[in-house]
Amino acid sequence: MKRTAWNIVFHSLIGLRARVLATSDPGLRGLEGVVVEETRHSLVVETRDGRRVRVLKANSIFLFQLPGGSWVVVRGEEIAGSLAERVKRLGRLKGVGWLVRAGEKRRYTRG
């Protein structure tokens, strides 16, 4: 399945370009690079100069560039936990709901 703004939290983030928009550590704000590692609680971002920096997911807001070139804002709480845990959360969604991202609304159903 293709990574989109609507399902990005249920995919691996490794390989995506990322920018830290907000975080509890002021020294990491504005950090930009490629996600090279993902754990339950953090992302490791490799910058252009080759530095690898660990950023905690909690209390952070990220901007990810999708493979098609568009950018999506994701709160750290949405990507908290391992990929398997995030997919389990998807399985617990019931019925019809709304996903809201970047000022748009899209209806989803669990089928």
UniProtKB/Swiss-Prot annotation:
Catalysis performed (reactions): Endonucleolytic cleavage of RNA, removing 5'-extranucleotides from tRNA precursor
GO molecular function annotation: ribonuclease P activity; RNA binding
Pfam families per the UniProt record, alphabetical: RNase_P-MRP_p29
E.C. numbers: 3.1.26.5
Assembly with partners or alone: Consists of a catalytic RNA component and at least 4-5 protein subunits.
Keywords per UniProt: Cytoplasm, Endonuclease, Hydrolase, Nuclease, tRNA processing
One example of a Gene Ontology biological process annotation: tRNA 5'-leader removal
Enzyme class: hydrolase
Compartments (UniProt record): Cytoplasm
InterPro entries: RNase_P/MRP_Rpp29_sf, RNP1, Rof/RNase_P-like, Rpp29/RNP1
Keyword tRNA processing: yes
Function, in words: Part of ribonuclease P, a protein complex that generates mature tRNA molecules by cleaving their 5'-ends.
Principal location listed in the UniProt entry: cytoplasm
Name used for this protein in its record: Ribonuclease P protein component 1
Protein source organism: Hyperthermus butylicus (strain DSM 5456 / JCM 9403 / PLM1-5)
Keyword DNA-binding belongs to the record: no
Family indicated by similarity: Belongs to the eukaryotic/archaeal RNase P protein component 1 family.
Source organism superkingdom: Archaea
Any one cellular-component term (Gene Ontology): cytoplasm
